[in-house]
Amino acid sequence: MNSMNNWLGFSLSPHDQNHHRTDVDSSTTRTAVDVAGGYCFDLAAPSDESSAVQTSFLSPFGVTLEAFTRDNNSHSRDWDINGGACNNINNNEQNGPKLENFLGRTTTIYNTNETVVDGNGDCGGGDGGGGGSLGLSMIKTWLSNHSVANANHQDNGNGARGLSLSMNSSTSDSNNYNNNDDVVQEKTIVDVVETTPKKTIESFGQRTSIYRGVTRHRWTGRYEAHLWDNSCKREGQTRKGRQVYLGGYDKEEKAARAYDLAALKYWGTTTTTNFPLSEYEKEVEEMKHMTRQEYVASLRRKSSGFSRGASIYRGVTRHHQHGRWQARIGRVAGNKDLYLGTFGTQEEAAEAYDIAAIKFRGLSAVTNFDMNRYNVKAILESPSLPIGSSAKRLKDVNNPVPAMMISNNVSESANNVSGWQNTAFQHHQGMDLSLLQQQQERYVGYYNGGNLSTESTRVCFKQEEEQQHFLRNSPSHMTNVDHHSSTSDDSVTVCGNVVSYGGYQGFAIPVGTSVNYDPFTAAEIAYNARNHYYYAQHQQQQQIQQSPGGDFPVAISNNHSSNMYFHGEGGGEGAPTFSVWNDT
């Protein structure tokens, strides 16, 4: 099929009815005149017919169709645009079928006269008739966009020059032409590629570390440890499983050791490690009490690339605003985290996490500190989450620190108009009465005439640094004394031993002050200012008695006895001591 390459030409101009073919001598030039075209590429024909040059050419827009009869050596091109359409044709025309022969029309006139041809190859139209202009502006634009380098190339033995359309299959000449175009285009593409800077791809598909399971991050430069968990691999799946991130490390060796520990946890001691198994004996024993996820999480927390605000303790994070430490435990409230509170130190937050872990996960819980540090039984039996001191194991259970021991004096004298209220507080624990510290100084003062002054009344408080510290840290520094009317003089002992007579009107004294109510005689009672803290109460049962006069303030017991003594006319002893406790 490639060898059958003849041209089939036809004219785009109006056709005549005359249809003939004539073979002429080589000395006679065949002239083909377009009888209707008056313009050839916007060139007007001369108006004088006598001087008109009859130029032999095929129609200016001759579109040829190959009839598959041309040999392989013929020159053909796709959309061949020949600029010499109006050139002088001196070669013999190759006889071939024309489209006009099939359509029954002709556009050629044969003349035996000599033909005058312009040196530039311009053609003169023999007739100035209209109808030859077919969008010349559009054709000129098309020609300018599709010009061919070899415009003067002529086909061998082919006198037809014009706009040619090749409809043949691929020939050797056209293949050569196309190959040349491909070479030019390929060369251009290569030039563009060579001028473009090449982007180097580092370590793609290559090992970036000599250790197993370690890769170097291209951007950060840190070494990351990864492990492929094939336990979640489904049947028929070609992937290695799920990639487990073990943390980022500054040193390559640390990342390799993290991989070794994770591999030992996942696959046992038979797996391949970067370092000898003898170096991980301690870690192998520790990881037996942890799940895979928990152990991987512990490895991540120890890595240098752990998240911002992380703590070395499990379940502890730092708040990004106020900087306090928060404790959370996961997977206990459905699939969400349970917030445990905010704490001042990491250790407190870590203890809160440990207590919650023991509560929700029992004895198999993974804690930050040793489980013997906590009262596990109390935590497990508690209906709520006992975060705080109540969940800790108290080493000195027999030595709790109570808040305060207070005792009062009750007047049993017949001359007593207003007496003390006998008040008692009972605590749930009964322990021996003991004294923490003794005061060496005695404080003397007295009350006279109902007014305190530097002249008639002298209240002497010898302030020491320890006493001031105690008073500042006491829950209450002052106790009010109610106003009471009395028909006799009162004797009030403040901070020591006092002999005084006067009408009592009432005033405020510090907590821990010993008060002796004696209407007739004086009493000397030893007092120590810091006998405030005791471990237990002395009496298990105490009565609350109300005297007709009203209530008097309570006072702290001295260091010599468990009771406050009252000295009056009838003589007698006051009420037993009592204590006030709190759970702090």
Curated annotation (Swiss-Prot):
A GO CC term assigned to this protein in UniProt: nucleus
Disordered: region residues: 150-180
Covalent S-S links between cysteines: none
Cellular compartments annotated: Nucleus
Recorded GO MF terms: DNA binding; DNA-binding transcription factor activity
Residues spanning the membrane: none
Database matches in Pfam families: AP2
Residue ranges with Low complexity bias: 164-180
Swiss-Prot/TrEMBL keywords: Developmental protein, DNA-binding, Nucleus, Repeat, Transcription, Transcription regulation
Record feature DNA-binding region, as residue ranges: 210-276, 312-370
Tissue distribution: Mostly expressed in developing seeds. Also expressed in roots, seedlings, and siliques, and, at low levels, in leaves.
Gene Ontology annotations of biological process type: cell population proliferation
Family, as annotated: Belongs to the AP2/ERF transcription factor family. AP2 subfamily.
Function: Transcription factor that, in opposition to HDG1, promotes cell proliferation and morphogenesis via transcriptional activation of meristem and cell proliferation genes, but prevents differentiation, especially during embryogenesis. Binds to the promoter and triggers the expression of epidermally expressed genes such as GSO1, GSO2, ACR4 and WER, and of HD-ZIP homeobox genes including PDF2, HDG1, HDG5, HDG7, HDG8, HDG11, ANL2, PDF2 and ATML1.
Record protein name field: AP2-like ethylene-responsive transcription factor BBM
Species for this entry: Arabidopsis thaliana (Mouse-ear cress)
Lineage: Eukaryota, Viridiplantae, Streptophyta, Embryophyta, Tracheophyta
